[in-house]
């Protein structure tokens, strides 16, 4: 009888027949690039809030990336990549005309705000998005979708400094009001996204819903503020992912005291119910082999790579 490994090998052989060409590459800032990938099936089915997992070559690591935009007519999907390791360095080195080995998706659940079944309720809300750094990429398609469906939203974009600011013009075109802030005060409001939100509330602005996307520490402190302000808050969790189907257990979270997996249950969750401290601690542990072994011991049946099938050992 054939095992699971044989199934994965057959799937890999099938996928190798289809490559995913890079039709556009653009530098957004130092170590941050945008790519348009020809991926007809993903482009046809994806919605804001979902993500893909890409591989540059047969031996490359699986890299989860949020869908930043899509064009169903051109059959392209836009991703934004920041170099943080060998896998993203390899991807950054590719040029227009080159191809990715794998481009699997769409994965995860679409944003609850960007679903037509919820549209009438969404139209009643005054929404503010807070994008922290690379979190700008997943915020953009949501705000764009809302504008196309008659829903206005304010957007706060936060960056460490003006040199890594990107998508200002694109966001300005779809947001009702755009507020840009930098930690060092080199551009826009001097402060972070939470401080900008507090300033807006102090000035008399009211919001029924906040969507915060960015580094975990940024989302944690945004949620502490919005809980105090009694603003329901959605976060998009970005823990380590390997297979994107819930098998590997890398993206395990605790939400409202229950185990959830960001890749299949999310990536969006009620920010006021997420255990951010546990998620950040776990993310640090997962970066080392010793840490993965400790998590495997503590979590038992949850898989933590090394099987040779899911790619967690690559």
Region spans (language model):
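Short, small-residue-biased leader/transition segments that mark boundaries at the very start
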Residues: 1-8
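Ferredoxin-reductase
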Residues: 15-98
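A generic structural signal for residues embedded in beta-strands
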Residues: 54, 102-103, 253
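Short, surface-exposed secondary-structure boundary micro-motifs
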Residues: 57, 105-106, 256
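Short, Lys/Arg- and Gly-enriched loop/turn segments at beta-strand edges
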Residues: 60-67, 107-117, 263
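FNR/FR-type flavoprotein reductase catalytic core
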Residues: 89-242
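Local cysteine-cluster metal-coordination motifs and their immediate loop/turn environment
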Residues: 138, 216, 238-268, 302-313
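Short Fe-S-cluster ligation motifs
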Residues: 261-265, 269-314
